[in-house]
A protein has these predicted regions:
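Solvent-exposed, flexible loop/coil residues
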Residues: 110-115, 156-160
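N-terminal, membrane-interfacial amphipathic/helix-forming hydrophobic leader that caps
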Residues: 1-111, 253-266
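Transmembrane helix-loop-helix hairpins at the membrane interface
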Residues: 3-11, 26-40, 131, 135, ...
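Membrane-water interface of transmembrane alpha-helices
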Residues: 55-69, 132-147
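Exposed alpha-helical structural elements
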Residues: 78, 119, 150-151
Length: 266
């Protein structure tokens, strides 16, 4: 989940947290321009691809991490967090759509329809695999003495209205994150670092993007991102990962909630 800062907080962060957030933000700015220059000059990508990849691989994950000091230990307004994330995700997804489909249309970002039976089988299979990752991480976390972050627990929907908006957030995340980090980024990066390298790089960034879930959550979403990347490449279509990602978020966030999260007592 990505979003803003002050509108999400019931209590403001302290000065040390703001300084740390500013430092991380400046790091993101520097990394963004470094990636743009490298991709546009020595590599020779078109400027719009260089800028968009720099946003996906540097700016978005680093700026997401910059939010963490601001929201550590404060009360979150969940609805504001959901809506700001929805807007951010749709902007990101729309940018990837326009840039990624400019030459070859929707097929360039993997939006290729499968026959009904393969579509259902791939979507269900990836959903089950993703849920299995979540379930298996509970005993792993217990063995390692880890637990899910307080922030992740706090962001889970509680009321009917929150569950409704969280469902919209799940759709936005499933569509936009898959379009950005699988459908757009992997095909653009594959000629530069190979398909495997592109899948690994985008999977690592995808995990870091979920830093609000804590170290355990970063690893878990990274593994899940790897599963979805494999599903995209193996099926030849982005639709199964989009459907699976959306269903996983709905199941984990609304249906099962905290019962799937790891704690030291579990």
């Amino acid at each position: 989940m990505t979003g803003g800062n002050d509108p999400l907080l019931a209590d403001g962060p302290g000065a040390p947290a703001r300084r740390l957030a500013r430092g991380i933000t400046w790091l993101g700015v520097v990394l963004f321009w470094v990636v743009v220059v490298i991709l546009a000059r020595p590599v020779g990508l078109p400027l719009y691809d260089a800028i968009l990849l720099a946003v996906l691989l540097a700016a978005v994950p680093v700026f997401s991490m910059a939010q963490l000091p601001l929201i550590d230990g404060v009360q979150i307004d969940r609805l504001s967090a959901y809506w700001s994330s929805i807007v951010t995700l749709w902007i990101l997804g729309t940018a990837c759509w326009f840039v990624g489909t400019r030459d070859m249309g929707a097929t360039a970002v993997g939006l290729v329809w499968l026959a009904p039976v393969p579509l259902v089988l791939w979507s269900v299979g990836l959903t089950l695999a993703g849920m299995l990752v979540i379930v298996l991480f509970r005993p792993i976390a217990s063995w390692a003495g880890g637990e899910d972050s307080r922030l992740l627990r706090q962001l889970l929907p509680r009321t009917r209205r929150e569950r409704q908006v969280f469902a919209l957030l799940s759709v936005a995340a499933g569509g936009s994150e898959e379009l950005a980090y699988r459908g757009y980024a992997i095909p653009v990066l594959a000629p530069l670092i190979g398909t495997f390298g592109a899948a690994v790089l985008t999977t690592v960034v995808f995990g870091i993007l979920h830093g609000y879930q804590g170290r355990l959550g970063i690893l878990r979403t990274g593994v899940m991102g790897g599963v979805l990347a494999w599903g995209f490449l193996a099926s030849g279509s982005l639709w199964p990962p989009i459907i699976a990602h959306t269903l996983i978020d709905l199941l984990a966030g609304i249906v099962f909630g905290e019962r799937l999260l790891a704690s030291r007592e579990s």
